[in-house]
A protein has these predicted regions:
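C-terminal transmembrane helical hairpin of 12-TM major facilitator-type secondary transporters
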Residues: 106-152
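Pair of pore-lining "gating" transmembrane helices in MFS-fold secondary transporters
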Residues: 37-57, 141-145
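Helix-to-loop junctions at the C-terminal end of transmembrane segments
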Residues: 91-105
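Multi-pass alpha-helical transporter architecture, strongest
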Residues: 8, 205-219
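Short amphipathic helix-loop junctions that connect adjacent transmembrane helices
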Residues: 60-76
Length: 219
């Protein structure tokens, strides 16, 4: 609430007055309806949303998996969580450095592929026990780190053709992404069985689903 107040009071509008829009609810819903039928937009928005959903499953499920199942002390859990946050920042910085040399579409394909592979690898090591706790930590680190590449790339690709309605497109994309995160949390609670499998299953589904939905919808 404080941040919203500061933005409202002190962050100036940079868009020239002649380019500003004052759409009512009907116009906004009409724009959203059009965007929901746009395969290019939805392919990128849903891909990003699914990958983010996997991150929400990690956030909700990892305290139980780390501390209850693998004996990580509460004071040490923050180290693992912080390491993943650093991974996100590093992936974001690497993406920014490569954007002038590698096509964004290719980078996004690579990031989504890594997300899918790491999510499926997490499921495999969870089901088999191969590599133990270290393998779970490593695969989660790779998956979560890719958020730093997937989020900016899906947003840029989704909104590139919609500059005239960038605000509405951004709002819809945010709604879809955080809606996917909420659904991932609900699914985790519904599937919880006292093991690490529900978290791994949702992360794997979200990673593979993000890769698949972009491949199917973006032509």
């Amino acid at each position: 609430a404080i941040l919203l107040l500061v933005i409202a009071l002190f962050l100036p509008e940079t868009l020239p007055p002649e380019r500003r829009r004052r759409d009512g609810l009907r116009q906004v819903l009409g724009v959203w309806r059009r965007l929901l039928g746009d395969g290019y937009f939805m392919g990128h928005a849903l891909a990003g949303g699914l990958v983010i959903g996997g991150m929400f499953a990690y956030i909700a499920g990892s305290p139980f998996v780390f501390m209850e199942l693998h004996g990580v002390r509460a004071e040490d859990y923050g180290f693992y969580f912080g390491a993943n946050a650093i991974g996100i920042m590093l992936a974001g910085q690497i993406t920014a450095r490569l954007v002038d040399r590698v096509a964004p579409a290719r980078m996004l394909t690579m990031a989504l592929t890594i997300s899918a592979v790491s999510g499926l690898a997490l499921l495999a090591v969870t089901m088999t026990g191969f590599g133990g706790f270290a393998a779970i930590v490593a695969t989660l680190f790779v998956y979560v780190s890719m958020i730093g590449a997937v989020m900016p790339l899906t947003a840029a690709r989704a909104m590139a053709p919609h500059g005239a309605i960038a605000g509405n497109a951004s709002a819809l994309m945010g709604t879809l992404q955080f809606g996917a995160g909420a659904l991932a949390g609900v699914a985790l609670g519904a599937l919880q069985d006292g093991s690490a499998l529900p978290m791994a299953l949702i992360v794997a589904f979200c990673g593979a689903g993000g890769w698949m939905v972009r491949r199917l919808l973006v032509k």
